[in-house]
């Protein structure tokens, strides 16, 4: 290991400190000769290599080997020696060329001596006297005493030392200016780079200002004293005062960017990225403070559950933080669906208000700041994302990832076992941490008999087989097990835990023990209700598990395509027009989807026949306008887009036929349209459009004449509703597809009720 000798050798002690015969050129020649005589694989510490050096081979001109060795010792004392001799010589060459570069400039014999500070003048004057008075004291103790004495000096006596310091300081500055004139080459070497100084942070600007103020009052204060005095003041500043320095820092940042861009144009060889120039000097907290004072609105909770928790936690300051989320979750589960929907509506309203306020805030900002805020808020796709409560979350990434999505690894038998038993163990042994709980579950799994393990392995095999069957584009999160069934005691505990925690002052362990005792002392009649609920939960679990094992139902795999400029499809009949009107005006937004469709059906039954005819005429008029607009739009398409549109319509018909079953009337229409297209190729596009409209008309007629059949009214209405919502709200296609399926199944009750009504009216 390379290392510096602990003590100098006799040769080093005897080395002369100045040899006038050696010029800079001679010293560089000496180092070059030494370099040429070094071994090729020099990896020893420098002293070892130096001891094996043949100095007679290094000798040159009139300089003998011994003279070269002495000069080398003198030079090597000026450089760091924790290296090999090869590295040392390179450093020595640099030192010979620039002996006073950087911090070594002050070692130059002509460099003026810096004046002593007022305190050091006092210290040097009194030290000898105090050392005689207290010979037993160490230098450190003497320094402490003299420092204290200096602080206790009256200002009049201190002024004597300060004036002497200022007088010598002026003289030093004059001598320094003279030194710079006499040695311009040294000053050039010591000069710092001309790259513009980086901008300071708000705290640095404040500290520099406060330091100047502090030194005016106490010019003799040390750097440590200044830091100690100002250290904690920044964090105690009011927001208003801190904003002042934030604005100054931003102004300085802007000036720096302009200067730096000019500098880069003059020095293109510098590799400085734009990111390095525009890097912010504000912390996240400072940026948020500035935005808040500029009028940026506070972001609302992402969903109804978070909103509920935020409101509940405001009144739970006395509850330990570890218990708050548990209580919130339990209280949320006890809410009725109507109460949850109210929170959902409230959350949606807060989001809408927030978006309006944020857009107003963005308008007041310059373009660069707008981009920053948009990036932070992730608002570039804000209209495509709808946050829902935990109870109504749906996978929104089914079609987005496509074939590039990495398949999810099926859960193992041990994982299935752990998920079933974890909740029970958490309640029985709440003192265990998550890691301890996992280790305990692993031991329990190992202790299970093979017969019991076989049950979980069968579930694992079923999940694995299902994962392999699933096509790549339609992967769902089916690997997750349904929520484990709860025991009767668990369901009862969830309903009463709030009361018990309040009784035992949020001591969960005591509350659980008390609940356990109460449950054990309860009569069977009292437990019966909870036992029934547990049985229902068990059935639910088995049903969901069997659904998960079953192969996925065949669905329409064709992705809904969007064509730019395509006219919006209007309602097919009076009932759909009536439904669209009620859904778009927001009158039924407070109801869940199923209840909305039921309410629409009942309202349709209650309106008069003349009103129904009015809606029917409106739908027919919109259909006529739609045909004209669609015809013009199709003719305006390029040949490639037209072909793609035709293919999409054709596939859509095929899929709808598969879902609805055979329809002789539509099949005759299709055959007829095919024969027409074969006879006249020039009118192929128009025929296709007419064919589509004929089919739409037939569907509309059948839904009106037949009384809004379950398939036509619910399916077409939901499809049209989705297309309108898609254009208005710009939602994801996956959400539209999900809603289509919901409406198809859920609209049957309303449509069937309306069918009776319309058929009655026709008969009348």
UniProtKB/Swiss-Prot annotation:
**One GO CC annotation:** nucleolus
For the modification Phosphothreonine, the affected residues are 201
Primary subcellular site in the record, as a coarse category: nucleus
The UniProt regions of compositional bias labelled Basic and acidic residues, in chain numbering, are: 370-379, 457-488
Enumerate the GO terms in the molecular function aspect: chromatin binding; RNA polymerase I cis-regulatory region sequence-specific DNA binding; RNA polymerase I core promoter sequence-specific DNA binding; RNA polymerase I general transcription initiation factor activity; scaffold protein binding
Q: Which domain of life is it from?
A: Eukaryota
Keyword Amino-acid biosynthesis included in the entry's annotation:
no
Q: Which InterPro entries match?
A: HMG_box_5 (IPR029215), HMG_box_dom (IPR009071), HMG_box_dom_sf (IPR036910), UBF1 (IPR051762)
Q: Residue spans with biased composition (Low complexity)? A: 746-758
Regions of compositional bias (Polar residues) in chain numbering: 664-674
Give the Phosphoserine positions (modified residues): 273, 336, 364, 389, 412, 433, 435, 484, 495, 546, 584, 638
Q: Briefly, what is this protein's role?
A: Recognizes the ribosomal RNA gene promoter and activates transcription mediated by RNA polymerase I through cooperative interactions with the transcription factor SL1/TIF-IB complex. It binds specifically to the upstream control element.
Q: What is this protein called?
A: Nucleolar transcription factor 1
Species this chain originates from: Rattus norvegicus (Rat)
The gene is Ubtf
């Amino acid at each position: 290991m390379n290392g510096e000798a602990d003590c100098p050798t006799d040769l080093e002690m005897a080395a002369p400190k100045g040899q006038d015969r050696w010029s800079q050129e001679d010293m560089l020649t000496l180092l070059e000769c030494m370099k040429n005589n070094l071994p090729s694989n020099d990896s020893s510490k420098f002293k070892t290599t130096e001891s094996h050096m043949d100095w007679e081979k290094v000798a040159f001109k009139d300089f003998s080997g011994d003279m070269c060795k002495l000069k080398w010792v003198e030079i090597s004392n000026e450089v760091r020696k924790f290296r090999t001799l090869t590295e040392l010589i390179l450093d020595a060459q640099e030192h010979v060329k620039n002996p006073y570069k950087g911090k070594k400039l002050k070692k130059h014999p002509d460099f003026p001596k810096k004046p002593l500070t007022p305190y050091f003048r006092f210290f040097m004057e009194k030290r000898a006297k105090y050392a005689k008075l207290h010979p037993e004291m160490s230098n450190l103790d003497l320094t402490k005493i003299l420092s204290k004495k200096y602080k206790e000096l009256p200002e009049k006596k201190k002024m004597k030392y300060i004036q002497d310091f200022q007088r010598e300081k002026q003289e030093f500055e004059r001598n320094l200016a003279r030194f710079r004139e006499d040695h311009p080459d040294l000053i050039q070497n010591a000069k710092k780079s001309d790259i513009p100084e980086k901008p300071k942070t708000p705290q640095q600007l404040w500290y520099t200002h406060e330091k100047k103020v502090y030194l005016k009052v106490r010019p003799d204060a040390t750097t440590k004293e200044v830091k100690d005095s100002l250290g904690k003041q920044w964090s105690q500043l009011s927001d208003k005062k801190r904003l002042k320095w934030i604005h100054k820092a931003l102004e300085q940042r802007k000036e720096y960017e302009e200067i730096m861009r000019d500098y880069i144009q003059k020095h293109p060889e510098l590799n400085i990225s734009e990111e390095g120039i525009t890097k912010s000097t504000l912390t996240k907290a400072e940026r948020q403070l500035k935005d808040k004072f500029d009028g940026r609105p506070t972001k609302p909770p992402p969903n109804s559950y978070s909103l509920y928790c935020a409101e509940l936690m405001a009144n739970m300051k006395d509850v330990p933080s570890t218990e708050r989320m548990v209580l919130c979750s339990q209280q949320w589960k006890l809410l009725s669906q109507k109460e949850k929907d109210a929170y959902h509506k409230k959350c949606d309203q807060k989001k809408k208000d927030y978006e309006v306020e944020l857009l107003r805030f963005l308008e007041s900002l310059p373009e660069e700041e707008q981009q920053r805020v948009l990036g932070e808020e992730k608002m570039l796709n804000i209209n495509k994302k709808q946050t829902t409560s935990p109870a109504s979350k749906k996978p929104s990434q089914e079609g987005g990832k496509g074939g590039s999505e990495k398949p999810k690894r099926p859960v193992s038998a041990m994982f299935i076992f752990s998920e079933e038993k974890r909740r029970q163990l958490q309640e029985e042994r709440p003192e265990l941490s998550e890691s301890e709980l996992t280790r305990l579950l692993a031991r329990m799994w190992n202790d299970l008999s093979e017969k019991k393990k076989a049950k979980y392995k069968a579930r694992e095999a079923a999940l694995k087989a299902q994962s392999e069957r699933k096509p790549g584009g339609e992967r769902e999160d089916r690997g997750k097990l349904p929520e484990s069934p709860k025991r009767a005691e668990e369901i009862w505990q969830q309903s009463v835990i709030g009361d018990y925690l309040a009784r035992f002052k949020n001591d969960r362990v005591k509350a659980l023990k008390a609940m356990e005792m109460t449950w054990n002392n309860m009569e069977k009649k009292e437990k019966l209700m909870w036992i029934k609920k547990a049985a229902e939960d068990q059935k639910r679990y088995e049903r969901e598990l069997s659904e998960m094992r079953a192969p996925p139902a065949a669905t329409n795999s064709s992705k809904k395509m969007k064509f730019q400029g395509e006219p919006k499809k209007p309602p097919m009949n009076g009932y759909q027009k009536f439904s669209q009107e009620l859904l778009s005006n927001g009158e039924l937004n407070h109801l869940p989807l199923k209840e909305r469709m039921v309410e629409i059906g009942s309202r349709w039954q209650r309106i008069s026949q003349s009103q129904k005819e009015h809606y029917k005429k409106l739908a027919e008029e919109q259909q006529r306008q739609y045909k004209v607009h669609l015809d013009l739009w199709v003719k305006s398409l390029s040949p490639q887009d037209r072909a793609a549109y035709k293919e999409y319509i054709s596939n859509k018909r095929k899929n709808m036929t598969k879902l609805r079953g055979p329809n002789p009337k539509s099949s005759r229409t299709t055959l007829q349209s095919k024969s027409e297209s074969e006879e006249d190729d020039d009118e192929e596009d128009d025929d296709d459009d007419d064919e589509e409209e004929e089919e739409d008309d037939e569907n509309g007629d059948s839904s009106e004449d037949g009384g809004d059949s379950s398939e036509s009214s619910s399916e077409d209405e939901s499809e049209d509703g989705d297309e309108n919502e898609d254009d208005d709200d710009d939602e994801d296609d996956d959400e539209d597809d999900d809603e289509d399926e919901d409406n198809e199944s859920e609209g049957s009750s309303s449509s069937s009720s309306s069918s009776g009504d319309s058929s009655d009216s026709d008969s009348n």
